[in-house]
């Protein structure tokens, strides 16, 4: 008979235990508490409206802190000193590589630039 399902045929220990559940607990790294210069205070007050006797809730949120601290970027937003304004958009020009553009320069059905490959002259001419 063949092997039962899930039976290993030998070899070294799998490094995929994290994926398939090796039974060992992975220690989590200790993260220091994030310290910010801001404090947020929320106050909720409930009063009774005199006209209809309905409860009226007022919530006040106050944020205090040091506004002179360096601005922090959101997650995924990279602050770079090389971030300059490009008038044509971010993907124009060869600012990443010195390779030529792959932009199509001829209309469909127009003159072919593959004459060097097939040994023919310009489109429509007979040699």
Swiss-Prot record:
Under InterPro entries, the record lists: SPR1/2/3/4/5
Its keywords, alphabetically, are:
Microtubule, Phosphoprotein
Q: Where is the composition biased (Low complexity)?
A: 39-48
Q: Which residues carry this modification: Phosphoserine?
A: 80
Disordered: annotated span:
1-127
Q: Does the keyword Zinc apply?
A: no
Q: Tell me one GO biological process term.
A: cortical microtubule organization
Where is it expressed, tissue-wise? Ubiquitous.
Output compositional bias ranges, type Polar residues: 80-94
Q: Which GO terms describe its cellular component?
A: microtubule
Tell me the function of this protein. Acts redundantly with SPR1 in maintaining the cortical microtubules organization essential for anisotropic cell growth.
Sequence similarity = Belongs to the SPIRAL1 family.
Protein name (Swiss-Prot/TrEMBL): Protein SPIRAL1-like 4
Q: What is the lineage of its organism?
A: Eukaryota, Viridiplantae, Streptophyta, Embryophyta, Tracheophyta
